[in-house]
Regions:
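Alpha-helical transmembrane segments
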Residues: 1-24, 53, 58-76, 90-95, ...
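Membrane-interfacial loop-to-helix junctions in multi-pass inner-membrane proteins
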Residues: 4-11, 31-45
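Membrane interface segments of multi-pass transport proteins and intramembrane proteases
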Residues: 30-39, 76-84
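Alpha-helical transmembrane segments and their helix-start/interface "positive-inside/aromatic belt" motifs
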Residues: 39-48, 113-119
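Residue-level signature of the cytosolic catalytic core of signaling kinases
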Residues: 85-89
Length: 192
């Protein structure tokens, strides 16, 4: 399935599980009372989950190499150019906003049959391709993309996710026979 000693692989898997617990608790309360968690409780849980993921990210991931130079993890590159920007502590704020925002964005699009799944399929498909390329030093040097050590392992996990989403879409398209719920939509958005 995947290399569980790979820190990139574990980061995505652990973040998926943490956000799945957040979504499951909301679905469980919704099942028992008819209403889900309040917005404050839901955002508090997701904020704590996001901070846990960012802490795990800081502790376990290395930087990347780009055109024979090594950069720290707070640097970002503009694709297909030679520009590298070090965001410093603002990088973690950006990570926080992206994780929390995408988790809730996918949750909002889950209201219509097949909408969340269809849009996630294209996004995760593109990310799968990028992780494969970013994990290969030859491709990255040719395309002026950063080489990220051990990130190619995510291709396996994301491919599994793509396959399961394709199977889910068959039963979630109009008229939907099954629904994703918060336990599915929130962790998928956080994974993106």
């Amino acid at each position: 399935f995947g290399n569980f000693s790979n820190s990139n692989f574990l980061l995505v898997l652990v973040s998926y599980c943490i956000f799945a617990i957040c979504g499951f608790s909301d679905d469980l309360v919704k099942l028992k009372t008819g209403k889900g968690l309040s917005i404050v409780k839901k955002l508090t849980m997701q904020t704590v989950a996001t901070l846990i993921v960012i802490f795990f990210f800081i502790k376990n991931l290395d930087g990347f190499s780009y055109l024979s130079e090594v950069y720290n993890i707070t640097s970002i590159s503009l694709p297909f150019t030679k520009e590298i920007f070090n965001l410093g502590p603002y990088y973690y704020i950006l990570c926080f906003l992206i994780i929390l925002g995408s988790a809730n964005a996918v949750n909002l699009t889950d209201g219509l049959d097949g909408l969340a799944t269809g849009s996630i399929l294209s996004t995760i498909g593109a990310i799968t391709l990028l992780t494969y390329i970013a994990g290969n030093a030859i491709y990255t040097s040719y395309l002026y993309l950063p080489y990220i050590v051990n990130v190619a392992e995510l291709t396996i996990l994301l491919s599994c996710l793509l396959g399961s989403l394709l199977g889910f879409l068959w039963f979630n398209s109009n008229p939907a026979q099954i629904f994703m719920g918060d336990v599915g939509s929130i962790p998928l958005g956080a994974t993106i």
